[in-house]
Amino acid sequence: MMMSHYDLETKCLHSGYTPKKGEPCALPIYQSTTFKYDTTDEMGQLFDLKAEGYFYTRLQNPTNDAVAAKIADLEGGVAGLLTSSGQAANFYAIFNICEAGDHVVAASTIYGGTFNLLGVTLKKLGIDCTFVDTDASAEEIAAAFKPNTKVLFAETIANPALVILDIEKFAKVAHEHEVPLIVDNTFATPINCRPFEWGADIVTHSTTKYMDGHAVQVGGAIIDSGNFDWDAYGHKYHGLTEPDESYHGVVYTKQFGKKAYITKATTQLMRDLGSIPSPENCFLLNLGLETLPLRVERHCENAQKVAEFLDAHEKVSHVIYAGLPNDKYHELAQKYMDKGRTCGVISFELTGGRDAAVRFMDSLKLANIATHVAASKTMVLHPASHTHRQMNDEQLREAGVSPGMIRLSVGIESAKDIINDLKEALENA
């Protein structure tokens, strides 16, 4: 069933899987590693990428593909690939078009794990990264580019600094330098922001967060808009535009057109590196996606109330939440986010600094101290001690993380109960 004219709420329920007569209404779990064919030639056609189908779940599985298609539809992309984690998604998204000797430019205010991936791990593979201030001018961002730059990377809403990305600015710089803009859209989700509509080329997600919503599965997604012209810059992206010796000389852009990028990531990287999620995890993810619009709306409503409460409290020195009119990124949120809604995550600092933050967190009763974020239950974390612990002081400043910053992931409980829990904990801070 074609879903292009339906609203996102409807796509969350119906896109990706349309049952035929007598088939299950719920997405089936294809719990199988392998798939049967009648002849050796049929199987051979699959291995040569000359036919569509399934032969081994490490590359593709019907359950996984249905969910990937749903997320691609939500983002307005042409194709998608699910991975075993958000980190795997970001790694694949970059490594699919980068190799030893290449260079990446990335916003500095990104999740600590991604910062380490780009700044440390990829360096071991011969891929260098230059970090730029997300608020830098287009000229300052452009100055970080080198002749061997292949990618510009950023997050729509930075974790945990909550910087709102000026997507059009970043897209313009990327395209002027003939590279794609890859945007991690985890916090915003396609319910609140669709980066392709503002010039981004590839979107990634940690589906572990709002898309799942219940902290029961770990996963990631890569979605391609199909808009970046790889052939126009074939001298840079020869992995897509020149013959792949591992598939008897197939040229991805020639054979797969707008789906070349995702096809290469699936048939080459997933084949060699794995990182495929289990069909059961994808089934759970699909259940989360079905209620995503309802949950995102409630998360944002609750977060707005909590942010206003914190902003007015005498023990809170400052609150970072773009839903507040006095927030630095309020105008960008109004521009890029549906109805100005961003996410359910708030960052704030207490007047007593780091010690007060510890006392506050240890006094919470309803909210859980947990590494996770963007789940249905309220959770709290101290980034400098947890997610960004591997950074030095200078790197923390560049990432927008102060020593006393608290990251609060507001759940979908009663807003009154959440605020009362915070109020009691603040008395002990």
Task: List each model region and its residues.
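PLP-dependent enzyme catalytic core of the Aspartate aminotransferase-like
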Residues: 1, 119-120, 128-129, 147-150, ...
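N-terminal "arm"/small-domain region of PLP-dependent enzymes with the aminotransferase-like
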Residues: 2-61, 69
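Conserved PLP-enzyme active-site core in the AAT-like
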Residues: 9-18, 81-312, 320
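Short loop segments at secondary-structure junctions
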Residues: 34, 225-228, 350-353
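Conserved N-terminal alpha-helix of the aminotransferase class I/II PLP-enzyme fold
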Residues: 39-91, 113-121
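Glycine-centered tight turns that cap/initiate beta-strands
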Residues: 76, 148, 315-318, 366, ...
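Conserved small-domain helix->loop->beta segment predominantly found in fold-type I
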Residues: 273-276, 280-282, 287, 291, ...
